[in-house]
Amino acid sequence: MDTLYKGPALTAELLEKRIREFNWELHAVAQWREPDPKARWHVLVKDNICVDGLRATAGSKAFKALKNDKDAFCVQKMRSKGIHPFGKTTMSELAGFLSTTMPMGYSELGAQGINPIDPDLTPGGSSSGSSISVAAGFCDAAVSTETHGSIVIPAMACGVVGMKPTVGLISRTGVVPISHSLDTPGATARTVNDAARLLSLLAGPDVDDPYTDHCPADLDLTTDLGLSKTPIRVALLVPQDGFDPEQKTALENLIARCKTVNIKIVEAPLKTVETHYKRISSTEIQGDMDKFLSQWGNGQTPSSFKELVQFYRMRDQHHPYGINRLEGALEYDPDLTNNDYLSALIEGTENCRLAIKDTLYTATADAIIAVGFVPWWAVGQAPYIALPIGQRQNKEMIGITIGARQWEDRKVLDIAARIEAILNRD
């Protein structure tokens, strides 16, 4: 068997066989139970999301003993609709908030995640284990999370689909936090339709997460997905230095195929935008982590963000890439009424939303395509989805993201499904 899975629908027996045979070298599944042979869909959950009876470590020794007898709200939603997760996926330690030099997909607990396409390629991060698991046939889909590219980057690296929804579509209650303004669970899957199905299972209002107040109680993002033949325009963001030859070839194929199904792709400039991501996340993680640990900690973990930093300082010999990102957060005032923080939050989110709005308006477009990661949707709290469009000679995948405005999740999925369908034609 190949580590990269391209076969038919997975059975419990087959995925269990694949996990046992390949997980030791891919380091994608952190914990798992025997999957239910009667289940029609098999889902894993990123290891920063609380699941009853399983640890929620975020890849960190500090949280090795963090085990709850309750589910995160989004997991409760999924269970209420008959889907029960059977395990946890590995991830970049603390969702990448440990060090700026740490490789994507690495954690002390989970080791280095390996891309099933080629071990020399990055798996991306921080939802590395989710994308590796989907690509390797360890599950049908995986619940992942994103603050700043953590769903779409590994999805593009591993050649799968990954959607980060509008912040507020899915509750963050019971998820190890970085930023309440930007964090969200999302979906990693083999197809756009599977991603839409998982998002529909996870979505819904939660009284403990005010960002979800505008989310419908019973959201269905799958009905008639990708079946529309209505002509649409999509803006392609072009960097100042353009695209390399292999990207150009993949894009030319994409543009030509899209023309056959009434999707016109027009070029638009990729603008440089000040997001203030570092200040926003460094400020918010301090109070957000304090709150999470007070509600979900169990006495065997640090009880505050400062204690978490101290835990790492006392074990610096175990962290070959340092802890500069984690320590650096302490340089920022955690007070959410601080004017510098408020100005950065307002300016950063508005800059990104305006970049999306202006691009759509100027190009008279319905959505926007970017090659690789562009932070507009992460900091603008808006939806975008990653899918593969080609592959380089060195086997590295060429991926795009498709994004739109806040709460246009259905539109993003529909356009992605139409594009996916034409790319899959012979």
Question: What residue spans do the PLM features occupy?
Answer:
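An N-terminal boundary/leader segment
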Residues: 1-31, 53, 252-262, 310, ...
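Residue-level signal for inorganic ion chemistry
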Residues: 15, 195, 234, 258, ...
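Glycine-rich, small-residue loops and helix-cap segments
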Residues: 46, 80, 84, 139, ...
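A short helix-breaking turn/cap at a secondary-structure junction
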Residues: 28-31, 164-252, 425-426
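Short glycine/serine-rich loop segments
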Residues: 72, 79-202, 382-390, 396-399
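Short helix-loop capping/hinge segments that flank enzyme active sites or metal/cofactor-binding pockets
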Residues: 40-61, 231-233, 283-350, 388, ...
